[in-house]
Regions:
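Short beta-strand-centered aromatic/proline hotspots
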Residues: 1
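Amphipathic alpha-helical segments that form the core helices of the histone-fold
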Residues: 266-268
Length: 313
């Protein structure tokens, strides 16, 4: 392999990275007050707790039921930690079952002409970007982190994400270059606890992350404000019924709290209308209940009748 293949970042590129020349010039301050306003939680100390565990572990996974806003929270936690809404210091990727070391770190990648080219992946690239800008914090958000095999995806870099090994160097197998995960890089993963088709995370990965469970927040100040702005009595009744539904789901021996219905289904960015409610219930909530209780159609029908009565009332 020639020298040009090994040299992913020349001096000019590194200088641009350190100056953030590709960053958004409209960067604005982002405070805990912004986080509390945008991220719904029934825990008034939510922001402080998340910041504390992120600082302590440096690698965290936000886990929870569908619709609790895991990715939304992850990005705003990054903004709050850096103090700015600066997307140039945040990278978001999504794992899937076919995601590989070559996709994430580096490797030979097929080209349109049938040849292969040696390319750096997003993790390698982002680590290098953070490394040349050590006075600022950088954040990698990994959606659906449990859909990929983390140890295979990271390869020999797997040990380097651990906080105690930040800054250490190892030799990468593809190019014999020394590589390390910088101390100013934070990793925030998200994980859907209601996905039956995924294997459990191995203990080696669990030891490198702190796990934080996000819960539905229908009683939070932020969600109550959405209901108040909508001025829709049916919306209020549906929300109360979803809270009752979540109690039933959490007590179900085959399901549990990890399968509850999150509040973000109803966070539409505008006043929630009767038509919105009908679409959410009919095409999002009910298909989910069909999946949850596929062996108990009577339960599904009972809830469908209850929601229909509210919507038609």
């Amino acid at each position: 392999m020639d020298d040009t293949t090994l040299n992913f970042f020349d001096g000019e590129t590194l200088t641009k990275m350190s100056r953030n020349e590709d960053s958004n010039t409209n960067i604005r301050r982002y405070t805990k007050a912004d986080f509390d306003r945008e991220v719904f939680s029934e825990d008034k100390d939510n922001a402080d707790k998340l910041l504390s565990i992120l600082q302590y572990k440096q690698n965290i996974i936000l886990q929870g039921a569908p619709g609790v806003g895991k990715t939304y929270t992850a990005k705003r936690l990054a903004y709050m930690k850096m103090g700015y809404k600066d997307d140039s210091r945040l990278m978001q990727v999504q794992f899937h079952q076919s995601y590989t070391y070559e996709d994430f770190v580096m490797g030979l990648r097929p080209q349109s002409d049938g040849t292969f080219k040696f390319e750096a992946g997003p993790f390698y690239t982002f680590c290098k970007k953070a490394e040349v800008d050590p006075t600022k914090e950088y954040f990698m958000v990994i959606d659906e982190i449990n859909r990929g095999n983390m140890s295979k995806i990271l390869g020999e870099a797997f040990s380097l994400i651990e906080k105690d090994h930040r800054g250490e160097k190892i030799t990468l197998k593809y190019n014999n270059i020394q590589f390390g995960v910088p101390k100013n890089l934070y990793i925030i993963g998200t994980m859907n606890t209601a996905d039956r088709g995924l294997v459990q995370l191995d203990y080696a990965l669990r030891r490198r992350f702190a796990f934080i469970t996000l819960l539905p927040a229908y009683s939070s100040t932020g969600f109550r404000a959405i209901m108040a702005r909508s001025q829709n009595v049916k919306f209020n009744r549906i929300a109360r019924s979803i809270k009752d539904l979540n109690i039933e789901i959490s007590k179900d021996d085959m399901l549990g709290p990890g399968f509850m219905i999150g509040h973000s289904y109803f966070c539409l960015g505008h006043k929630v209308t009767d038509e919105d409610l009908s679409n959410i219930i009919e095409y999002e909530i009910m298909p989910l209940l069909d999946e949850y209780w596929y062996d108990f159609p009577d339960k599904v029908e009972r809830w469908h009748e209850k929601f229909t009565k509210i919507l038609n009332g």
